[in-house]
């Protein structure tokens, strides 16, 4: 019994690690596209991945939860929610961006950025919930 649990834990660790690697790569590529190709401010890259990640995690959590239509293993849930979304989203970059704005004399914009990003991320999560609930019907 103990060996089975250890094997299951190893599967979860691998799932989270693989998902996190993919999520981090997607975050990097998203930021690169937004800054290098579109010429936008790096704040848009941080905002984009946090908003998209909020939608994905709620959408997937609702579809694969107890009343969800999709039956997936715990490893798949961890791959998507803990790994992919965890690697994609970035609270630390949002914090850094906010403090850099304050340090450069843009405190009002920093507050607007922070409040706006939290609002939009929560709104995206709500849209993910609504979309998944419609599929679950």
Swiss-Prot record:
Activity regulation remarks: Na(+) is not transported, but it plays an essential structural role and its presence is essential for fluoride channel function.
Entry keyword annotation includes Transmembrane: yes
Keywords, alphabetical: Cell inner membrane, Cell membrane, Ion channel, Ion transport, Membrane, Metal-binding, Sodium, Transmembrane, Transmembrane helix, Transport
Acetylation recorded as keyword: no
Subcellular location: Cell inner membrane
Primary site of residence: membrane
Molecular-function GO term, any one: fluoride channel activity
Family per record: Belongs to the fluoride channel Fluc/FEX (TC 1.A.43) family.
Name used for this protein in its record: Fluoride-specific ion channel FluC 3
Species: Brucella abortus biovar 1 (strain 9-941)
């Amino acid at each position: 019994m103990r060996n089975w649990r250890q094997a299951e834990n190893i599967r979860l660790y691998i799932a989270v690690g693989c998902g996190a690697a993919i999520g981090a790569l997607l975050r990097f590529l998203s930021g690169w596209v937004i800054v290098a190709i579109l010429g936008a401010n790096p704040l848009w890259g941080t905002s984009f991945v946090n908003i998209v990640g909020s939608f994905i995690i709620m959408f997937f959590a609702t579809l694969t939860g107890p009343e969800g239509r999709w039956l997936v293993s715990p490893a798949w849930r961890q791959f998507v929610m803990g790994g992919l979304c965890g690697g994609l989203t970035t609270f630390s970059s949002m914090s850094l961006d906010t403090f850099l704005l304050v340090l450069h004399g843009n405190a009002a914009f920093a507050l607007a950025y922070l409040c706006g990003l939290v609002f939009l991320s929560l709104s995206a999560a709500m849209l993910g919930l609504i979309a998944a609930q419609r599929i679950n019907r």
